C-alpha cells in the first residue's frame, strides 16, 4: 500500500451510507476507528468482502451481532450490477456494467494458466485516439473506487470467489478498458491498492498492469503512489504518426513520454526493469518495415518487451487491419534488434470485446459525436 493516503472523490451512496467498496484498507481502518471499533475489524470485513465476495453483513459470522447491526445502519457493500453478458466462442466474456445511468464494459479472458480481467477506469475517454472505439464516443466522468474495484468484485462473484471455489478466479488485472487511468488517479490508485492487498484480492504487483497513452505528469505521480506493472500505448515510431493517431502526443511527445517511463522503471520493482510497449498494427499507417527499424532505434534506451496488436475494427473507423504478412515482417525486424516481440492473440472480437472495441454507453460531455457530425464525419459506434 502506498504511504500516501489517497482519498476517493466520493464514498457515500444516495441514501447517505458509506459504500465500503470505496475504501482501501487504511481508509477502512479509519472508518472502524470512527465507529469506536478496533482496526482489526476492518481486516475481518475486507476478507469477507473480497475473499468470499460477500455483500451481506449478516453472513459475516465472526463479526458480533451488535457491530453487524451498526454496519447495516451506516454502511453497505454495493458493487455495480451487470446488465448484459456476452460470451465469445473463444471463452471470453464481456459484461456491460451499469454505473449510474450509463454503462462501461469489463472483459474476462480465461486461458489455461491464467484468467485476466480487463477493467475500465472512466465512462468514455477524453484522449481521442483515432483507432479506438471508446475514444470516438467522448468523455463523461471518472469512475469511483467502488465502480472500479466493483468490476473485479462482480467478475469474481460470477466466476467464483477464491474462498468459495478454492481457486483464484482472476489471476491478472489490466487497467486497459474504457478510459485513461492516469486521468483518474485519485480513484484508480486506491482501487489497485485493494487489488494488491492481502485482505483484498491479494494479487501480485506484477499481475496488476496499468496502461497509459502518455499523461506524463500523472505518470510521475504514479511512481510515488503505488508500484504496479506498466504498459504504454505507443502505437507509432515517430512523432509525426503519433500526433495523428494519439493526439495527446502533441502535448507530451514520444521523447518526453519515454523519459517519464524510464523514471517510473527506476522506482518500480513490479516491472522487473522493463515496460510493455503496446503497438496497434494499422495497415499502411505504422506497419512498414521502415517503421519497425524506426521503432527499434527509438526504443534502444528503454528496456522493454513489445506487444504487436492486430487492430480490431469498429464501424466508421478510417483504418484497416494489417495483414499477417506485414505483421510478421514487422515482428522479425524488431527481433533482429534483440527485442522480445509478441503478436497478441485477438480474443473476443466476435462480441466486440477485443482491444480497442469497448464501447459501453456514454453520455458525451465533450460533445465529440456532435462535433464530428458537424464536420461531416460519419459516426456509427456500436453500443452494447
UniProtKB/Swiss-Prot annotation:
Residue span(s) of domain Radical SAM core: 111-350
Cofactors that this protein relies on: [4Fe-4S] cluster
Top-level taxon: Bacteria
Function: Specifically methylates position 2 of adenine 2503 in 23S rRNA and position 2 of adenine 37 in tRNAs. m2A2503 modification seems to play a crucial role in the proofreading step occurring at the peptidyl transferase center and thus would serve to optimize ribosomal fidelity.
Entry's Gene Ontology molecular function annotations: 4 iron, 4 sulfur cluster binding; metal ion binding; rRNA (adenine(2503)-C2-)-methyltransferase activity; rRNA binding; tRNA (adenine(37)-C2)-methyltransferase activity; tRNA binding
Protein's GO biological process: rRNA base methylation; tRNA methylation
Family: Belongs to the radical SAM superfamily. RlmN family.
Pfam families per UniProt: Radical_SAM, RlmN_N
Catalytic residues identified in the record: 105 (proton acceptor), 355 (s-methylcysteine intermediate)
UniProt EC number: 2.1.1.192
Bridged cysteine pairs (disulfide): 118-355
Binding residues for S-adenosyl-L-methionine: 179-180, 211, 233-235, 312
Keywords: 4Fe-4S, Cytoplasm, Disulfide bond, Iron, Iron-sulfur, Metal-binding, Methyltransferase, rRNA processing, S-adenosyl-L-methionine, Transferase, tRNA processing
InterPro entries noted in UniProt: Aldolase_TIM, Methyltransferase_A, RlmN_N, RNA_MTrfase_RlmN, rRNA_lsu_MTrfase_RlmN/Cfr, rSAM
Keyword Phosphoprotein applies: no
Catalysed reactions, semicolon-separated: adenosine(2503) in 23S rRNA + 2 reduced [2Fe-2S]-[ferredoxin] + 2 S-adenosyl-L-methionine = 2-methyladenosine(2503) in 23S rRNA + 5'-deoxyadenosine + L-methionine + 2 oxidized [2Fe-2S]-[ferredoxin] + S-adenosyl-L-homocysteine; adenosine(37) in tRNA + 2 reduced [2Fe-2S]-[ferredoxin] + 2 S-adenosyl-L-methionine = 2-methyladenosine(37) in tRNA + 5'-deoxyadenosine + L-methionine + 2 oxidized [2Fe-2S]-[ferredoxin] + S-adenosyl-L-homocysteine
Remarks, miscellaneous: Reaction proceeds by a ping-pong mechanism involving intermediate methylation of a conserved cysteine residue.
Protein name (database record): Dual-specificity RNA methyltransferase RlmN
Residues spanning the membrane: none
Sequence positions that bind [4Fe-4S] cluster: 125, 129, 132
Lineage: Bacteria, Pseudomonadati, Pseudomonadota, Gammaproteobacteria, Enterobacterales
GO terms under cellular component: cytoplasm
Localisation: Cytoplasm
Cofactor, how bound (note): Binds 1 [4Fe-4S] cluster. The cluster is coordinated with 3 cysteines and an exchangeable S-adenosyl-L-methionine.
Entries under SUPFAM superfamilies matching the protein: Radical SAM enzymes (SSF102114)
